[in-house]
C-alpha cells in the first residue's frame, strides 16, 4: 500500500479532464493506491483551483484533495467557501504556499486557517525550503506550531535542502509532521538526503509522510528512493501509508 500525500495536477495536458486521466494512469503505473491532490490558492490555475479539484475528484474514492488558500487572494470569500467544502467533507487538508507567496507561517493573518483546520480536524500544510525559504524557516514553523497547539502542521519538503536543520528545530513540536515530497528531486543530493532521513526517521517514525510532488517531480523516483532507505520495515510502512492515513484521516 502506497499513499502519495503530495500530488498536483500535471502540466502538458490541454485541459483538466486530461490532467486527471494522466494523474490516475500514472498512479496506477507507479503502484500508488491513494493520492492527495493539492489545489492552487489561485482562483484559476493550471494545477486546479479549490473548485476544480473538488469537482474533478469527487468520483474517485482513492484520490483526496487538499485546498490551497492565500491571505492575498480573495481571502474572506475563499475562507467561507473552504468552510462550506470542509463541512461537506471534501478536503482532507489546507495548504499555504509560504515562499511561493509572501506568507509567513507564523503570521497572525493565518489564524482563521488554523481555526478551520482545528474545527474540521484536518492538517495545515505549508511549503518550506527553496524559494523565499525565510517565510517558513524552522524557527517560524516552531512558533506557528506553539501558537496553534490544537492544529496539525505538515511541513512540505522539510526545508529542502536543509533537512537536518528542519528536523532538529522541529522535533520538539509534537504537532508538526514532515512531508517528504520533492526531497529526491536531485539525484546528486539523494545520498546525503538519505543519510539525514536514516538518522531522523527512527527517532520519530510516526511523523514522516511519503509524498512525491507529482506534477512537479518524478513520482517513480521518489518511491524508489524511499523504499531504498536503510530503516526498519515497520517504519517504512508508517512513512509510505500509515502516517498519512492517520494524519489526514483517510482509510487505507
Ligand atoms: Zn507541491
Over which residues does each language-model region extend?
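Divalent metal-dependent hydrolysis catalytic cores, especially in the metallo-beta-lactamase
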Residues: 8, 22-44, 62-70, 92-93, ...
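Alpha-helical scaffolding within the catalytic cores
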Residues: 18-23, 47-55, 78-81, 138-140, ...
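Active-site gating/metal-coordination segments in enzymes
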Residues: 34, 48-125, 130-131, 174-176, ...
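Histidine-centered catalytic micro-motifs
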Residues: 2-10, 125-129
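Mid-to-C-terminal alpha-helical segments outside catalytic/metal-binding sites
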Residues: 1-5, 17-34, 118, 204-207, ...
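Active-site neighborhood of phospho(di)ester-bond hydrolases with catalytic His/Asp-centered motifs
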Residues: 2-5, 36-39, 66-68, 95, ...
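Catalytic pocket-lining loop regions of alpha/beta-barrel enzymes
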Residues: 92-93, 107-209
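Active-site environment of divalent metal-dependent phosphoester hydrolases
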Residues: 10-13, 42-45, 72-74, 101, ...
Amino acid at each position: 500500500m502506497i499513499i502519495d500525500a503530495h500530488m498536483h495536477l500535471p502540466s502538458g495536458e490541454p485541459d483538466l479532464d486530461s490532467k486527471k486521466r494522466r494523474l490516475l494512469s500514472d498512479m496506477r503505473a507507479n503502484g500508488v493506491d491513494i493520492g492527495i491532490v493539492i489545489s492552487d490558492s489561485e482562483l484559476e490555475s493550471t494545477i486546479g483551483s479549490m473548485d476544480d479539484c473538488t469537482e474533478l475528484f469527487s468520483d474517485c474514492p482513492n484520490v483526496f484533495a487538499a485546498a490551497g488558500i492565500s491571505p492575498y487572494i480573495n481571502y474572506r470569500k475563499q475562507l467561507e467557501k473552504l468552510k462550506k467544502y470542509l463541512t461537506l467533507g471534501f478536503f482532507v487538508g489546507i495548504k499555504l504556499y509560504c515562499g511561493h507567496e509572501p506568507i509567513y507561517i507564523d503570521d497572525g493573518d493565518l489564524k482563521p486557517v488554523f481555526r478551520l483546520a482545528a474545527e474540521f480536524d484536518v492538517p495545515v500544510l505549508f511549503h518550506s525550503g527553496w524559494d523565499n525559504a525565510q517565510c517558513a524557516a524552522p524557527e517560524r514553523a516552531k512558533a506557528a506550531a506553539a501558537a496553534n497547539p490544537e492544529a496539525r502542521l505538515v511541513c512540505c519538503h522539510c526545508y529542502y535542502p536543509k533537512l537536518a536543520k528542519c528536523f532538529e528545530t522541529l522535533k520538539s513540536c509534537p504537532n508538526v509532521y514532515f512531508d517528504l515530497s520533492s526531497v529526491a528531486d536531485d539525484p546528486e543530493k539523494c545520498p546525503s538526503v538519505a543519510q539525514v532521513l536514516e538518522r531522523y526517521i527512527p527517532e520519530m517514525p510516526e511523523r514522516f509522510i511519503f509524498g512525491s510532488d507529482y506534477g512537479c517531480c518524478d513520482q517513480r523516483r521518489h518511491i524508489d528512493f524511499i523504499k531504498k532507505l536503510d530503516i526498519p520495515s515497520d517504519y517504512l510502512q508508517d512513512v509510505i501509508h500509515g502516517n498519512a492515513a492517520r494524519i489526514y484521516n483517510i482509510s487505507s
